[in-house]
Amino acid sequence: MKGHLHLPHPHNQRLQRIQAPTYERLQARLAEDHSEPTEKPLSIHCGWGRLLIGQTYPDAEELARDLLQEAPGERDIALYVAAPQQVLAHAPQQLFLDPSDTLRLWFTDYRPARRPPRGFRIRRVHTEEDWAAINRLYLARGMLPVQTERLSPRHQGGPIYWLAEDADTGVAVGTVMGLNHAKAFQDPEGGSSLWCLAVDPQCSRPGVGEALVRHLVEHFMSRELAYLDLSVLHNNQQAKALYRKLGFRELATFTIKRKNGINQSLFLGPGPEEDLNPYARIIVDEAHRRGIEVRVDDAEGGL
């Protein structure tokens, strides 16, 4: 699957804006560009888990099976799932529909910032010290650290990580991961995506998160790509407001994950057990992990 990337003409791009990513659409675009069809489903390891590229899977059962192969302590994500009900039907007890929205920014809609960021600089990750700084940020935000030995190599379409550091102290204050879809799975539409944006909760510099998003957008624009996608929790209104300001719009596609202790709050949601004391919560959480239904009769009394 090699060849020159053919980006859509403006009139074709308008049509693409209302079309969801699917396996059939990807194969049609590859055929249209006289490129080889995808030979097998593709996934990219990001150091904390795999991104399973949903539109490279011709079969829902195979996607469900691959999600069930998630390694202990990792977090796999199946993105661009067109028919999530078909995938969930193969493992309803182990998989769940992620309550996040996918947003897309077409680069033709992007407007650069009027002023450059001040007080920090953004650069690529190079050293072991850089990775340690990134993992410190992720752990501070309750996110999984990056296992560098697990990363898909860059020459095989692996991700790229960026670091924002304080201009005065050199201390890392933010990080973000980007994926070039043209390199990752020969995406004929010239897409890219943003993952794992994190800013130090103690950072006093304003605008670090927005600057990292803009940096990634402008980086992929310089690579002649067409759009950037990202995923945001459906009720994160503050983040959504920022993304809308930058030109992102909702995309009709879905994400599926495997149930684990890391994402438990996403598939359980708040319930009456929220008012239980810490010791009762331990028992309830363990019951949920084992798939046991819990009924709270008296939260104050721990019953």
Residue spans of the language-model regions?
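Acyl-donor-binding surface of acyltransferase catalytic domains
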Residues: L26-A31, W48-G119
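Conserved active-site alpha-helix within GNAT-family acetyltransferase domains
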Residues: A64-D66, A83-D98, E210, S222, ...
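Short amphipathic alpha-helix that is part of the acyltransferase structural core
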Residues: H4, Y110-V146
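Conserved N-proximal alpha/beta basic substrate-recognition cap immediately N-terminal to
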Residues: E274-L303
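C-terminal "cap" of GNAT-fold acetyltransferases
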Residues: L95-R114, L233-Q237, A252-D275
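A conserved beta-strand-loop-helix scaffold within acyl/acetyltransferase catalytic domains
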Residues: G142-L197
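Conserved beta-strand-loop-alpha-helix junction that forms the acyl-donor binding cleft
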Residues: T56, L79-Q86, L230-A239, I256-G261
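Conserved acetyl-CoA-binding loop-helix of GNAT-fold acetyltransferases
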Residues: D59-L68, C196-V199, R205-E218, R244-K245
